[in-house]
């Protein structure tokens, strides 16, 4: 199927799809708010939300929160740039919805007498479009902090921009191997390419070749980076309450605050949907249900897609309840010093492997011998290479001066107290001389 075949629908059908998708996302957000609260309560041995409807498990509490934010007064801080301050939530809201236009929710179905796909549209660079929209969403965060005329808001927006840009690089690199294996950046074609059976040693396993299984390092890197992109625990540094009150949304209230609240949960669902599409087989039935063709086509794809995506959302909630917040320097070191180098090395390795397979070099014994020698040399160098003495260049510990900053600070257990200096030393010397001279 060509990626552009999904754009031949009548205009009225495209509008219907957009409206239905918009309603689904709003309802799904309400469900995910309730779902997160209930899961956190169960993991923390609490009751959780039961307000308004004990029989419904408290699901209407999320509805009440949304209505409350809609009707609350919208305040603008004194000194804020009013135009940019009000525009920032709109940018964040539009960006979180736009990515869903290229995410396939299912295969071909019959809708109002027309055969169509459960996807608004598809383009040859659909995944690149999703990454571009995510970059636009950063402006909604940066402009919110810059226009609020508040210290906490500005610091939160700067943290968020640095965090999202840093982890977007690693996320993009983790997806390159998916493009290499599928041969396309179209979301629908990537899903279809995962329907091929996994072949091991010439034996057909009849297991769908999902990329989470074939490209495990890429899958792990994407899962880590999606937490950084969504500003969720353990990477919620832009709005951590213990340091920045509420970060870049500190000065917002009412409907604009609700827009950021909505954008956070839709972004979480978007990243989960992208994970489902690129690594978990999309709307295809999981193994071994894929043996039954009846439940692996048509409207059944909608069920499998939402079940897989909800499973990833549950992982979001589980990590929030189980893992504490990272320190900022550790978080940035993880992105720049670990994830990006590992992603680059993995991309080179996968590209080289695909080249060897496509060119048929794997059958050449000379090539295999050369590769074996190189691998052995690398292993020997890694384990037998000279190691630098990490303690050789360390500077000796200097005596601790408790009055260096102007205030007395008690030394830590491993620090050495410096001798008294200045007036105190002079006074001590004068008293000693006075005692030695017999008081003269």
From Swiss-Prot:
The chain crosses the membrane at residues 11-31, 83-103, 123-143, 164-184, 207-227, 261-281, 299-319, 331-351, 366-386. It catalyses: a quinone + NADH + 5 H(+)(in) = a quinol + NAD(+) + 4 H(+)(out). GO terms for biological process: aerobic respiration. It is an enzyme of class 7 (translocase). GO terms for cellular component: plasma membrane. It is found in: Cell membrane. Its EC number is 7.1.1.-. Keywords: Cell membrane, Membrane, NAD, Quinone, Translocase, Transmembrane, Transmembrane helix, Ubiquinone. InterPro entries: NADH_UbQ_OxRdtase_su1/FPO, NADH_UbQ_OxRdtase_su1_CS. It is a multi-pass membrane protein. Pfam families: NADHdh. It comes from the Bacteria. Its main location: membrane. The keyword NAD applies. The keyword Plastid does not apply. GO terms for molecular function: NADH dehydrogenase activity; oxidoreductase activity, acting on NAD(P)H, quinone or similar compound as acceptor; quinone binding. NDH-1 shuttles electrons from NADH, via FMN and iron-sulfur (Fe-S) centers, to quinones in the respiratory chain. The immediate electron acceptor for the enzyme in this species is believed to be ubiquinone. Couples the redox reaction to proton translocation (for every two electrons transferred, four hydrogen ions are translocated across the cytoplasmic membrane), and thus conserves the redox energy in a proton gradient. This subunit may bind ubiquinone. NDH-1 is composed of 14 different subunits. Subunits NuoA, H, J, K, L, M, N constitute the membrane sector of the complex. Belongs to the complex I subunit 1 family. This is NADH-quinone oxidoreductase subunit H.
């Amino acid at each position: 199927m060509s990626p552009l075949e999904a754009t031949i629908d009548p205009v009225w059908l495209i509008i219907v799809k957009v409206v239905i998708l918009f309603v689904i996302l709003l309802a799904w957000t309400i469900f995910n708010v309730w779902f997160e609260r209930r899961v956190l309560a169960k993991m923390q041995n609490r009751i959780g939300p039961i307000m308004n409807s004990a029989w419904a498990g408290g699901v209407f509490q999320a509805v009440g929160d949304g209505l409350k934010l809609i009707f609350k007064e919208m305040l603008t801080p004194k000194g804020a740039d009013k135009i940019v301050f009000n525009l920032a939530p709109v940018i964040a809201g539009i960006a979180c919805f736009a990515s869903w236009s290229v995410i396939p929710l299912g295969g071909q179905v019959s809708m109002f007498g027309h055969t169509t796909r459960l996807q608004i549209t598809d383009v040859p660079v659909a995944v690149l479009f999703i990454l571009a929209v995510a970059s636009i969403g950063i402006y909604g965060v940066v402009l919110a902090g810059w226009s609020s005329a508040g210290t906490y808001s500005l610091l939160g927006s700067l943290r968020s921009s640095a965090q999202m840009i840093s982890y977007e690089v690693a996320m993009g690199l983790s997806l390159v191997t998916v493009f290499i294996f599928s041969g396309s950046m179209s979301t629908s074609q990537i899903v279809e390419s995962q329907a091929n059976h996994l072949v091991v040693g010439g034996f057909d396993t009849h297991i769908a070749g999902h990329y989470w299984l074939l490209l495990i390092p890429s899958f792990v890197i994407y899962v880590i980076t999606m937490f950084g992109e969504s500003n969720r625990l353990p990477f919620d540094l832009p709005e951590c309450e213990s340091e920045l009150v509420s970060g870049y949304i500190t000065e917002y209230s009412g409907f604009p605050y609700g827009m950021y609240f909505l954008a956070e949960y839709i972004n979480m669902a978007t990243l989960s949907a992208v994970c489902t599409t690129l690594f978990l087989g999309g709307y295809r039935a999981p193994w071994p249900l894929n043996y039954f063709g009846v439940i692996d086509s048509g409207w059944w794809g909608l069920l499998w897609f939402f079940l897989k995506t909800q499973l990833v959302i549950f992982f979001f909630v589980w990590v929030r309840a189980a893992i504490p917040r990272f320190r900022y320097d550790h978080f940035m070191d993880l992105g720049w010093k670990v994830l990006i180098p590992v992603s680059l090395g993995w991309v080179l390795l996968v590209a080289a492997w695909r080249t060897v397979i496509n060119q048929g070099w794997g059958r050449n014994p000379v090539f295999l011998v050369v590769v074996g020698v190189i691998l052995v040399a690398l292993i020997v160098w890694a384990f037998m290479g000279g190691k630098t003495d990490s303690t050789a260049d360390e500077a000796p510990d200097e005596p601790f001066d408790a009055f260096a900053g102007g205030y007395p600070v008690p030394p830590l257990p491993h620090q050495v107290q410096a001798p008294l200096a200045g007036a105190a030393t002079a006074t001590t010397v004068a008293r000693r001389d006075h005692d030695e001279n017999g008081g003269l």
